[in-house]
């Protein structure tokens, strides 16, 4: 098994606490409203805390698909949220697990910087596919910007 680590940052005009609330606390409600392709977010196991497994159902290529997302840690005081993709179409056959460690920090002019460390654990001696990695980054960036756009369009959300 190989472990490959990548880091990325995204900036937002939305304040960290407000963005965190939308991305973590109210995610099950906000994400389907903000991200056009996501149909639903539902808890399939757990109580919403660490260990909880959520099912994100979305449309891709005209088909309904899903990904299973396991909450690893929630750190509201430090605006941190860690989760893993543990099943569904987001987990290719060569990948054991994809983990995300996220944190929001103060950015310029009252905005935020979203920092993420992605760890890909492969099965056997498989290597991560570079094109899949680029596509995953593009999806993550689009997701982050969709939430930002939703919050900008709904200034009363708190």
Swiss-Prot record:
Compartment list: Cytoplasm, Cytosol
Residues annotated for Ca(2+) binding in this entry: 32, 35, 38
GO BP terms in the entry: abscisic acid-activated signaling pathway; defense response
Keyword annotations from UniProtKB, A to Z: Allergen, Calcium, Cytoplasm, Hydrolase, Metal-binding, Nuclease, Pathogenesis-related protein, Plant defense
Ligand binding (trans-zeatin 1): 8, 83
Sequence positions that bind trans-zeatin 3: 69, 81
EC category: hydrolase
Entry's Gene Ontology molecular function annotations: abscisic acid binding; calcium ion binding; cytokinin binding; melatonin binding; protein phosphatase inhibitor activity; RNA nuclease activity; signaling receptor activity
EC number of the protein: 3.1.27.-
Family, similarity comment: Belongs to the BetVI family.
Name of this chain's protein: Class 10 plant pathogenesis-related protein 2C
Organism encoding this protein: Lupinus luteus
């Amino acid at each position: 098994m190989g472990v490959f680590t990548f880091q990325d940052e995204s900036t937002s005009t939305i304040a960290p606490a407000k963005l965190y609330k939308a991305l973590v606390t109210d995610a099950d409600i906000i994400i389907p409203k903000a991200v056009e392709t996501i149909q639903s977010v539902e808890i399939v196991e757990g109580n919403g805390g660490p260990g909880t497994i959520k099912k994100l159902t979305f449309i891709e290529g005209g088909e309904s698909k899903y990904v299973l997302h396991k909450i690893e840690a929630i750190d509201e005081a430090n605006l941190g949220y860690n989760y893993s993709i543990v099943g569904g179409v987001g987990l290719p056959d060569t990948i054991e697990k994809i983990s995300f460690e996220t944190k929001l920090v103060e950015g310029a002019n009252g905005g935020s910087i979203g920092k993420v460390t992605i760890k890909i654990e492969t099965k056997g001696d498989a290597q991560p596919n570079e094109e899949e990695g680029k596509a995953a980054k593009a999806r993550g960036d689009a997701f982050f910007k969709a939430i930002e756009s939703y919050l900008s369009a709904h200034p009363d959300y708190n």
